Amino acid sequence: YEELRKIAAEMISEKTDISVEKVYDLFCNETGYQTPKVDTRAAVFMDDKILLVHENNGTWSLPGGWCDVDQSIASNTEKEVKEEAGFTVKAEKLIAVQDWRKHNVTNYAYGVVKAFVMCRYESGNFEENIETTEIAFFGKDEIPDHLAVEKCTREQIIMCFEAYEKPEMSTLFD
C-alpha cells in the first residue's frame, strides 16, 4: 500500500503542481478512499442584482466556503453569508450541484462538490472583516472581471441569475 500511496501522490502532484511531499502529507492521516469536500455558494439578490463579496486578495466572489461538519448545505450557506457579508439570509432553493474540476480553475489536490443556493435577504449590514473588504450588488451585465474563479466563475454567476429569473427552473447537477 505504501508504494501505491507514493505513486498516487506523484500523480496528484503532476496534475496539481503541488509538491509530492505536500500531497503525501495531505493524505497521511486519511483512511479509506477519498471523498470530495463540499463548498457552498450563496446567490443573494436585491433589486435584481446579485451580491458579491470583495475578498482581501482583490477578487470578487459569491459569498460561501467549505461546509463545516456540523452544518447542512442550507445552514452553512447562511452562516457564510453572515460571516462574509454581515447579512442574515434564508436559504430557499438549491440552484446547482457541480463538480469543481468541470467548472472552475483549480489545482487543488482534493475533489470538491460545489452547491449553489438561492437565498433571501432578511436583515443586516456589512462591516469589513478578515475575509471581506467590501460588498456590492451587480447586474447581469455588470459582473466584475477580477473573479475568484476557483470559487465562482462568470458562467456560474450567470447560472444564478437564470435561476433567479426563472424560479421554476429545476436544480442543475453534473
Question: What do the PLM-derived regions correspond to, one by one?
Answer:
Residues 2-41:
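Acidic, metal-coordinating catalytic segment for phosphate/diphosphate chemistry
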Residues 29-78:
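Glycine-rich active-site/cofactor-binding loop and its immediate structural neighborhood
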Residues 45, 92-95:
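Conserved positions in beta-strands of structured domains
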